């Protein structure tokens, strides 16, 4: 917590007027949303105590403070994945810092593989629930009763409704499904994909779940969106690679960023922390 306090002090010193209400966490293909920011300031993670050094292509490693529409936001452009260090709490300090700065909502994004043949590359999926296949938690070592976090409504129903309404208004098709977290960095085998489908998963990726757990532990309400970059292993003739993920993510980046910015700017945030479309 001392590191969180140091990061918070740094931000309050260099951005004393910042009062973000919504935290955004951007995965591969979603970086274009920063072009929708106004009155923005940028802080490299390297300049913020306890913030991780993102080592994966497509993750800038920068915090932006600004506005999207009338909503003050804090944008985490890039995350640290569990496979980079072996630890799954790499985003703990950034998320706790932004919560302390005033963020009551986390809108996070990722690039994912599809287990649904009808949901091909370039599709967007609203995360309704997740499966923690890694069976690890970023809360290990936490104390107090707050560590026993209920996850029955991990992805906020009213925020999902707002997202669907915005997508309908923009004419953007938005799938909804279950995201399954694998540690990586290797891609899944065809046999694993068949097993995951039997478990009820619709998309698979290497992030998002730890950050959702951290946000719910802090009391933040969560919305998550997946940009589908490929059909999962064994579902097509493609050889999966990170380069393919980045290339496919770039193709749909404009659509994804436009939808995300519209969702955030449409939120009506009341003083009591409620949100409505």
Regions found by a protein language model. Give the residues of each.
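Non-catalytic positions within long, well-ordered alpha-helices that form the structural scaffold/packing
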Residues: 99-102, 197, 216
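His/Asp/Glu-rich mid-to-C-terminal helical/loop segments that flank catalytic regions of hydrolases
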Residues: 233-277
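Metabolite-binding pocket within alpha/beta catalytic cores that recognizes anionic/polar moieties
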Residues: 1-151
